[in-house]
């Protein structure tokens, strides 16, 4: 596998995406501002530039960062091992510093399985140019059939939590820069906009649905009015 390539097959993806845009009809219904998950992703605001993020990487002082609730044995193990470490910042409870500053100040951002695998952490870390480290066995990550996850993220088995620092330090500076550059290439696919933008998170989810259009089957009475 070519770890420099962020797509499994970019040409097929681009052609299929064009066909999806041409043939797939999408109707968007507005949500209320207080709906669950309405504000789960970080606001776009002014997006950090690629050059700025690479320069910040050269000054990132923390090896790795995690902050979150201790709601699973995996997170509990992470905190037990690394809570007081000087290079891996593993934190539970309220942060004393802004969350974005921690993402900007860390080389690797830990995505640790909680009561569910899927959170906004991967999108957050990519947004700020922090290489995601996924610590969760038997997981299904977003867009895995489109994106080459190994080109911009690291997978660590939960049993290897005590070896986390050793694993991360195996990556040379050049290898880390390759991972980070690839992370910046794919971050557009994980970003959410109030009005969808081509290839953003909304369109990528629609593309995933479009790919599975022939495998989704609904009962014949699904659209029959009860009256």
Q: Where are the predicted features?
A:
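Acidic donor-binding helix in nucleotide-sugar-dependent glycosyltransferases
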Residues: 124
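Nucleotide-sugar donor-binding catalytic core of glycosyltransferases
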Residues: 1-120, 128, 134-155, 162, ...
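Short amphipathic alpha-helices within nucleic acid-binding modules
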Residues: 166
